[in-house]
Curated annotation (Swiss-Prot):
Taxonomy of the source species: Bacteria, Bacillati, Bacillota, Bacilli, Bacillales
Gene expressing this chain: lrgA
Keyword check for Magnesium: no
Keywords of the record: Cell membrane, Cytolysis, Membrane, Transmembrane, Transmembrane helix
Protein known as: Antiholin-like protein LrgA
PANTHER family (UniProt xref): ANTIHOLIN-LIKE PROTEIN LRGA (PTHR33931:SF4), HOLIN-LIKE PROTEIN CIDA-RELATED (PTHR33931)
Chief localization: membrane
Length: 143
């Protein structure tokens, strides 16, 4: 029984490692700077959506990594502290970029949500109309 858990952990670690290796290779060949971790997330998401990888194959290690995510951000926090001098020089520019990006992100997210919700409401209305038409056909009321 414990052998299966170890194998499951090792197979999940291998899947994550392979995805990160591929994303690192892709990141080095891209003409624009893109974090390999973001590329890895896109690859993992794509593989899950295409059902190349089943959720069960990566779920327990993903849950474990999510549980220690605060610990994984410690090196990033230390890097930010080491860069405080540079950040102080460009404080206004950095703050402006953060505020503008946040406003744009909120606007795009809101518009996208309205688009999706509006699409769902339209489909619901179309489905109701179709049911009424089909019900009328059953009773011989629609020509």
């Amino acid at each position: 029984m414990s052998t299966k858990k170890v194998y499951s952990f090792l197979s999940q670690a291998f899947i994550f490692s392979a995805i990160m290796l591929i994303s690192n290779i892709i990141a080095t060949h891209l003409p624009i700077p893109m974090p390999s971790s973001v590329i890895g997330l896109v690859i993992l998401f794509s593989l899950l959506c295409l059902k190349v990888i089943k959720l069960e194959q990566v779920e327990s290690l993903g849950t474990a990594l999510t549980g220690i995510i605060g610990f994984l951000f410690v090196p990033s926090g230390i890097s930010v502290i080491n860069s405080l001098g540079v950040m102080g020089q460009y404080f206004v520019q950095i703050l402006t970029v953060i505020v503008v990006a946040t406003v744009i992100l909120l606007a795009v997210t809101g518009l996208f949500a309205q688009f999706i919700l509006g699409k769902d409401e339209k489909e619901t209305e179309d489905t109701k109309e179709l049911k009424v038409v089909n019900k009328g056909r059953k009773h011989g009321k629609v020509a």
